[in-house]
Amino acid sequence: MNIDIRIEDNSAEVLKELDNKMPELLSSMGNEVCKHIQNFMTEDKIVDTGRLRGSISYSTPYIDYNIPTLANTANDFIKNNKEKNTVVYGSNVEYASYVELGTSKQRARNYVKTGTYRAIPQIKKVVETILKGE
């Protein structure tokens, strides 16, 4: 009795398909994390004029995503990320880090950190759905 075992290397095809899906994956991850950050900011009342919440944006090597509001300027948004396979998200508003990390007179609000943690389960689901081709 002969047993014939054949192993095929399909890694090149898998990597090519992953590379093809990368723009959609990164954009979906950016959408989810920004949505969760903005939702947390609303829940925790981290809104005064709306400029900071409106500036939450992301950038991938394929797209810069933002939704400008009347309170925002063009420089408020994250843009021009050229690093392969990454999503850069947050805000370029000059006081964003003070609200996130706090100051000697203001407690840290951790809106980026909390929103990111809240987004992780949904990001996993979205990525799985995209990779399965559903």
Language model feature labels by segment:
Residues 1-134:
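Short, Lys/Arg-rich flexible segments
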